């Protein structure tokens, strides 16, 4: 439960920090086709942060091993990258940099999933929706960047 709370808290903090900047995405920017309504994002992210936390908890509860430690470090790294992406995209509106940052996050996610798989298969499977959403987010980020230059 602690891992779920940690994940949700990071997401909530990022949301709180950029709350005054999110309006630009909703109103002032040209968004790419398939952009979901704004209400979808907090719902999806709440579920994804819960899945992240459940996966991390399963890893944490696994027997100590170098793979477990690596998995937890990767979890922390991707959570950090996830947090800062919101700040880069919404607060600074640095859409190109945000896309590069998101590509790095995507790589970390893929690496984390592979690391999780070596420790707990279910923990790894719980991260696939996150990777898929990050892929969709990259499409949206790219679209916003290209359409609003």
Which residues does each predicted region cover?
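Membrane-interface helix caps and helix-loop-helix hairpins in membrane proteins
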Residues: 85-97, 145-149
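Final/C-terminal transmembrane alpha-helix of multipass membrane proteins
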Residues: 126-145
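Membrane-interface helix termini and inter-helical loops of multi-pass transporters
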Residues: 20-34, 148
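Membrane-interface loop-to-helix entry segments
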Residues: 36-51, 92-105
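N-terminal signal-anchor transmembrane alpha helix
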Residues: 1-17
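Helix-adjacent hinge/juxtasegments
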Residues: 50-86
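Hydrophobic alpha-helical segments of small multi-pass membrane proteins
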Residues: 75-85, 99-112, 130-134
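Interfacial loop-to-transmembrane junctions
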Residues: 114-132
């Amino acid at each position: 439960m602690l891992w779920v709370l940690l994940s949700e808290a990071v997401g909530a903090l990022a949301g709180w920090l950029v709350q005054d900047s999110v309006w630009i995405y909703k109103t002032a920017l040209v968004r790419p086709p398939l952009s979901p309504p704004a209400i979808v994002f907090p719902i999806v992210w709440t579920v994804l942060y819960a899945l992240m936390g459940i996966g991390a908890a399963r890893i944490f509860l696994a027997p100590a091993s170098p793979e477990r430690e690596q998995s937890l470090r990767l979890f922390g790294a991707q959570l950090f990258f996830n947090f800062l992406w919101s700040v880069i995209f919404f607060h600074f509106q640095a859409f190109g940099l945000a896309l590069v940052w998101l590509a790095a996050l995507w790589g970390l996610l893929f690496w984390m999933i592979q690391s999780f798989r070596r420790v707990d298969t279910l923990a790894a499977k719980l991260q696939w929706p996150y990777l898929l959403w990050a892929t969709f987010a990259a499409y949206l980020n790219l679209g916003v960047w290209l359409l609003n230059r």
